């Protein structure tokens, strides 16, 4: 079956567009499967590829993007099961997130909880100086950065990071928690949805897929 979005696909292009449209409506895989008549296994496979496409888009638009980050997307996702810390910062009216890879978890836990102070030089070496907040997804808690080496205590005034975190927590509840293997993709999806909340999501994602078809992201473990 000819399908420009995915080679050797078993569903036609119109069905892929339907899945994408339902995805943009922020429905769950079960809801999409029930509406489209496509099996949940196939829906989940497509959603994973779509979310990976979105993650690449987010990485490319991150102010601290480095070209090799695209090759680390799978690595980021795999590290999530071991590390649940994500840095959050705002730049030019947009919210960005980054997985904090390979930190000393004991040191990081103590730092974000205000138990220890850290020299700014160490923060710069670990790329932690750029964040306005750090989210701990293992506990669904957000720690706000007050200054270079300290964290705030108590509730800060509501700003865009608070709004983004509220949306992120709502998604955690909606999906009844996040599987450790897909946490990274859901976080990037939330970042994408928040930064493009007033845009046509379907048009953006469809253009991405047309430029880079899903079969470029396909993995051996994905079934169609």
Which residues are covered by each model-predicted region?
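Residue-level recognition of single "structural anchor" positions
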Residues: 1-224
């Amino acid at each position: 079956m000819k399908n420009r979005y995915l080679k050797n696909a078993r569903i036609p292009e119109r069905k892929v567009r339907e899945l994408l449209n339902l995805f943009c409506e922020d429905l769950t895989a079960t809801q999409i499967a029930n509406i489209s008549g496509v099996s949940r296994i196939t829906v989940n496979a497509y959603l994973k590829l779509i979310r990976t496409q979105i993650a690449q888009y987010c990485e490319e638009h991150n102010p601290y993007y480095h070209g090799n980050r695209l090759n680390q997307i799978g690595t980021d996702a795999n590290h999530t099961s071991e590390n649940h810390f994500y840095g959050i910062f705002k730049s030019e009216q947009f919210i960005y997130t980054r997985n904090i890879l390979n930190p000393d978890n004991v040191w990081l836990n103590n730092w974000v909880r205000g138990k220890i102070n850290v020299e700014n030089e160490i923060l710069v070496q670990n790329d932690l100086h750029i964040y306005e907040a750090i989210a701990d997804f293992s506990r669904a808690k957000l720690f706000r950065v007050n200054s270079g080496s300290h964290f705030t205590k108590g509730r800060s005034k509501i700003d865009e990071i608070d709004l983004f975190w509220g949306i992120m927590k709502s998604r955690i509840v909606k999906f009844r928690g996040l599987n450790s293997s897909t946490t990274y993709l859901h976080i990037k999806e939330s970042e994408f949805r928040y930064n493009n909340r007033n845009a046509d999501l379907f048009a953006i994602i469809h253009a991405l897929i047309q430029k880079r078809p899903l079969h470029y992201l396909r993995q051996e473990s994905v079934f169609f």
